[in-house]
């Protein structure tokens, strides 16, 4: 069975107490949740349920919203793809942060924040659609992207691991050059170190098509022939046959 959505093994006791009580709706707990987001960024953990609770508080109390905390939550959500975490967080953002500018002054004041959200949403789309090379190209194309993920310790490494997990589900072997682009590892030595030490995969340099990375068989990438047998008895059509005769009569 999967882990329940509202569970997190690394969640501190005081955060758990807030989430399971009425204080989760108390605006005074906003600072506690904000500190917890900082902790997640530093310790490479992710608590989607707690982050959603904070975003809900922002929704009810827009004046308490801290743009940096929101972008950190979204950046952390990128490190757990593929999952609905990013979309859920995005859906809870206050209306004035959405990329639909209005004629009032608030729109100009939040333009930088909205641009940040748009950029993070772009990264999410690329990851969820498995456009990994384009993801890294986009991430490296603008210093603002680097600023948006700067507070998330090990961001690039966490994303690489998630990409590797998805590759392992779909491939038994993959060309090393392609994998270099997907993982944004700029040298063959770095690629070999990552796939052998982090992923426990093998590098084969003897093949006719150049260097390939071999992924061990698992329940996701194993080729299996599926045999389906369907037995349809006459009794299953008894009602249809009877109705046919009844209509004819």
Swiss-Prot record:
GO terms for molecular function: ribosome binding; RNA binding; translation initiation factor activity. Residues 46-222 form the PCI domain. The keyword Glycosyltransferase does not apply. Pfam families: CSN8_PSD8_EIF3K (PF10075). GO terms for biological process: formation of cytoplasmic translation initiation complex; regulation of translational initiation. One of its GO terms (cellular component) is eukaryotic translation initiation factor 3 complex. Disulfide bonds: none annotated. Coiled coil: none annotated. It is found in: Cytoplasm. Its main location: cytoplasm. Keywords: Cytoplasm, Initiation factor, Protein biosynthesis. The keyword Glycosyltransferase does not apply. It comes from the Eukaryota. PANTHER family: EUKARYOTIC TRANSLATION INITIATION FACTOR 3 SUBUNIT 11, EUKARYOTIC TRANSLATION INITIATION FACTOR 3 SUBUNIT K. Component of the eukaryotic translation initiation factor 3 (eIF-3) complex, which is involved in protein synthesis of a specialized repertoire of mRNAs and, together with other initiation factors, stimulates binding of mRNA and methionyl-tRNAi to the 40S ribosome. The eIF-3 complex specifically targets and initiates translation of a subset of mRNAs involved in cell proliferation. Belongs to the eIF-3 subunit K family. Component of the eukaryotic translation initiation factor 3 (eIF-3) complex. This is Eukaryotic translation initiation factor 3 subunit K. It comes from Aspergillus fumigatus (strain ATCC MYA-4609 / CBS 101355 / FGSC A1100 / Af293).
């Amino acid at each position: 069975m999967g882990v329940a959505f509202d569970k997190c093994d690394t969640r501190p006791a005081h955060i758990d107490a807030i989430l399971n009580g009425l204080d989760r709706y108390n605006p005074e707990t906003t600072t506690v949740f904000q500190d917890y987001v900082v902790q997640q960024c530093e310790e490479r953990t992710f608590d989607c349920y707690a982050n959603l609770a904070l975003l809900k508080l922002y929704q009810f109390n827009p004046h308490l919203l801290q743009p940096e905390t929101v972008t950190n939550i979204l950046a952390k959500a990128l490190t757990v793809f593929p999952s609905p975490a990013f979309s859920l967080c995005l859906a809870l953002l206050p209306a004035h942060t959405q990329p639909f500018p209005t004629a009032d002054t608030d729109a100009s004041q939040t333009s930088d924040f909205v641009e940040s959200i748009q950029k993070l949403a772009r990264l999410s789309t690329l990851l969820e659609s498995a456009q990994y090379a384009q993801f890294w190209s986009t991430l490296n194309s603008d210093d603002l992207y680097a600023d948006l993920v700067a507070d998330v310790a090990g961001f690039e490494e966490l994303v690489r691991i998630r990409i590797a997990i998805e590759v392992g589900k779909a491939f038994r072997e993959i060309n090393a050059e392609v994998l270099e682009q997907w993982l944004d590892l700029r040298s063959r030595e770095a690629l070999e170190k990552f796939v052998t030490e982090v992923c426990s995969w093998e590098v084969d340099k003897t093949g006719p098509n150049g260097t390939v990375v071999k992924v061990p068989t698992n329940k996701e990438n194993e080729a299996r022939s599926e045999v389906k047998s369907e037995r349809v008895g006459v009794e299953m059509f008894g009602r249809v046959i009877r109705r046919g005769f009844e209509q004819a009569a």
